[in-house]
């Protein structure tokens, strides 16, 4: 099962950056918000119906039936890709991946995630927790230093116009020197950190603490997923018209308010209050994620930087999402244990822990609002047509200076 999940994650990890690069290569700047919004809407269809179908399948046929369904979907997707997709643009058949860096990334990020996952069961003081985390951190540091050196050698060779170029870095971290891209990447990572943890915590509240079935849990979460599907589409269109700053600020505020409302859940809360708050949260997520991602990649120069930026931002978001769930679950269990020591029942202690985990998630969302307010500005944060006019003006000035 673990090997299967690794293969699933590897396939997904490859497809999403390639999809982003394709959109940025095909669509002009004036249409990228719309294109990314459409892509986001399509990518949200499965999360919209997945929990409901998964809950129904689990109740009816057991959890193994979910993987059978995924196998059928994977085969259909493979056939569609084989017969419906074709390459575009130039490509280099001689390009080779840096497999040593790939190994370092697997050891580094895998060890870190494995340690965080074990911390839920064994605590941070257990060797099975801190051991993999130490190995993972060493692997990540080695990976970063190796790719920084490889990037420096590659750029020096390109600048000297050498015929034989050295191997490019697996992950070009130089894009993080772009302030706007870094702000966008951190903002999206915070959103994933705060958001993914709720997808773990709230089913525990619905099923374990309130006693509802897995199917009912999926139905409660369904409206939010549909809301994100729609809001990502309109968020992309709104970015083209109004710019990234107002749309992302609106989305981050809505996400914060929804998380704050969800932190008010109690033992006797109307169960559909969870659905309403999750709907509000995912509306905010849709209006935040696509505009901030599109804006941060728009601030990079050329296809090579966009390709590197897409890989970096997706890596950062996946790490944040993977770390966010175990960290907040650990905090939830810690608060629950403290409350239980005071004489509370198991259910009351669990809900107390969930409330505090959601309050911490609200604080993270508030930090994200401040980052958008103070960080999303300058070139690329305004309306798309203003960005195009500004870039055209800069190009004309550069041509005049070159002519003189």
PLM feature spans:
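Juxtamembrane C-cap of transmembrane helices in multi-pass membrane transport proteins
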Residues: 114-123, 296
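12-transmembrane solute porter fold
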Residues: 41, 61, 127-132, 142, ...
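Long, low-complexity inter-transmembrane loops of multi-pass membrane transporters
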Residues: 140-167, 389-404
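Intracellular terminal tails of multi-pass secondary transporters
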Residues: 356, 373-404
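Interfacial loop-to-helix junctions that mark the boundaries of transmembrane helices
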Residues: 1-3, 7, 60-69, 96-98, ...
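Helix-loop-helix hairpins in multi-pass membrane proteins, especially solute transporters
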Residues: 1-100, 268, 329
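Flexible interhelical linker loops that connect adjacent transmembrane helices
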Residues: 30, 78-106, 124-125, 150-179, ...
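C-terminal membrane-cytosol helix-exit motif in multi-pass small-molecule transporters
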Residues: 71-90, 107-118, 136-154, 368-376
């Amino acid at each position: 099962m673990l090997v299967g999940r690794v293969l699933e994650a590897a396939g997904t990890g490859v497809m999403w950056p390639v999809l982003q690069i394709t959109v940025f290569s095909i669509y002009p700047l004036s249409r990228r918000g719309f294109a990314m919004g459409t892509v986001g809407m399509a990518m949200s269809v499965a999360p919209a119906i997945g929990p409901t179908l998964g809950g129904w399948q689990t109740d009816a046929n057991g959890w193994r039936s979910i993987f059978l369904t995924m196998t059928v979907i994977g085969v259909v997707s493979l056939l569609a890709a084989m017969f419906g997709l074709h390459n575009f643009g130039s490509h280099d058949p001689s390009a080779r991946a840096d497999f040593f860096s790939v190994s370092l990334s697997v050891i580094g990020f895998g060890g870190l995630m494995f340690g965080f996952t074990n911390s839920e069961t064994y605590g941070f003081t257990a060797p099975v927790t801190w051991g993999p985390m130490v190995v993972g951190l060493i692997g990540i540091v080695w990976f970063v230093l190796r790719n920084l050196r490889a990037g420096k050698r590659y750029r020096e060779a390109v600048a000297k116009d050498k015929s034989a170029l050295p191997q490019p870095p697996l992950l070009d971290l130089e894009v993080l020197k772009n302030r706007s891209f870094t702000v966008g990447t951190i903002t999206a990572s915070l959103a994933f950190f705060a958001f993914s943890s709720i997808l773990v915590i709230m089913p525990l509240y619905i099923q374990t603490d309130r006693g509802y079935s897995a199917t009912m849990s999926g139905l409660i979460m369904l409206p939010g997923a549909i809301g994100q599907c729609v809001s990502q589409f309109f968020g992309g269109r709104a970015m083209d018209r109004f710019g990234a700053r107002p749309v992302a600020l609106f989305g981050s505020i809505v996400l914060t308010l929804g998380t704050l409302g969800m932190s008010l859940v109690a033992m006797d809360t109307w169960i559909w209050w969870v659905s309403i708050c999750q709907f509000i949260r995912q509306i905010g997520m849709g209006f935040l994620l696509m505009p901030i991602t599109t804006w941060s990649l728009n601030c990079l120069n050329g296809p090579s930087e966009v390709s590197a930026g897409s890989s970096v931002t997706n890596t950062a978001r996946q790490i944040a999402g993977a770390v966010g769930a175990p960290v907040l679950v650990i905090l939830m269990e810690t608060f629950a244990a403290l409350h239980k020591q005071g004489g509370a029942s198991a259910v009351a202690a669990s809900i107390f822990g969930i409330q505090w985990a959601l309050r911490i998630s609200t604080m993270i969302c508030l930090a994200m609002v401040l980052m958008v307010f103070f960080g999303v500005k300058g070139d690329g944060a305004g309306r798309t047509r203003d960005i195009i006019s500004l870039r055209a003006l800069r190009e004309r000035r550069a041509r005049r200076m070159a002519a003189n």
